[in-house]
Regions:
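Glycine/Thr-rich beta-alpha phosphate-binding loop at enzyme active sites
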Residues: 31-40, 44, 78, 83-135
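Active-site beta->alpha loop and helix N-cap motifs at the rims of alpha/beta catalytic domains
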Residues: 1-25, 30
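Glycine-rich phosphate-binding active-site loops on the catalytic face of alpha/beta enzymes
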Residues: 28-30, 91-102, 144, 151-167
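Catalytic cores of alpha/beta
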Residues: 73-87, 130-135, 145-162
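Short beta-strand/loop segments at the ligand-binding rim of alpha/beta enzyme cores
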Residues: 1, 55-73, 129-141
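Active-site glycine- and acidic-residue-rich loops that bind
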Residues: 1-11, 38, 45, 66-86
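Generic structural signal for well-ordered alpha-helices
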Residues: 10-18, 42-53, 78-83, 123-127, ...
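Structural preference for beta-strand elements that scaffold enzyme active sites
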Residues: 23-25, 62-66, 91-94, 137-140, ...
Length: 167
């Protein structure tokens, strides 16, 4: 984060990175970055999506851009993100990053909660976004995956791909 304005940061990063990978992830979900999750609110999310797509077009790039979504969003945010994603042909959503809900673990821990405690919440978001987008947006399922059964569960709920951090 070099500037106050996220769009300036994303522009700098996109122009440096778009030739180097197979896809780009815009992580709007980190619980450790103050204010970052505010970018999942509809007006902010739409600005980011349209800005990134404009940058991609200006650079004659076809690189897929995926957006990592927080598990700690409201039902309205889910609907708004789904509608914006459909209207703007978003390449995919990564569901989900760590949660700030510590009800299932020691509440004194700092940072976000991941691993097994995130599994059910991640699955809920996968199911909801798959339904809200009628399966038209690719979903990468992540969170609480420990074995093949966990992978199958996420795929049955609508995940197209799976991402595993550590198990």
């Amino acid at each position: 984060k070099d500037t106050i304005e996220i769009l300036d940061d994303l522009k700098k990063l996109f122009e440096r990175l778009y030739r180097l990978g197979d896809y780009i992830v815009i992580n709007l979900s980190s619980p450790n970055t103050p204010g970052l999750r505010d970018n999942l609110k509809s007006q902010n999310f739409e600005k980011i999506v349209t800005s990134i797509h404009r940058l991609r077009d200006e650079n004659n790039s076809k690189i897929p851009v995926l957006f990592k979504i927080s598990p700690d969003i409201s039902e309205q945010d889910k609907k708004d993100i789904s509608l914006i994603s459909l209207a703007n042909d978003v390449d995919g959503l990564i569901l989900t990053n760590t949660t700030i809900n510590k009800s299932m673990v020691n509440k004194k821990l700092e940072g976000g909660v991941s691993g097994r405690p995130l599994f059910l919440k991640s699955n809920e978001l996968i199911r909801d976004f798959y339904t809200l987008t009628s399966g038209k947006i690719k979903i990468i399922g992540v969170g609480g995956i420990f074995d093949a059964d966990d992978i199958l569960t996420k795929m049955k709920l609508g995940a197209s791909l799976i991402q595993i951090y550590s198990s």
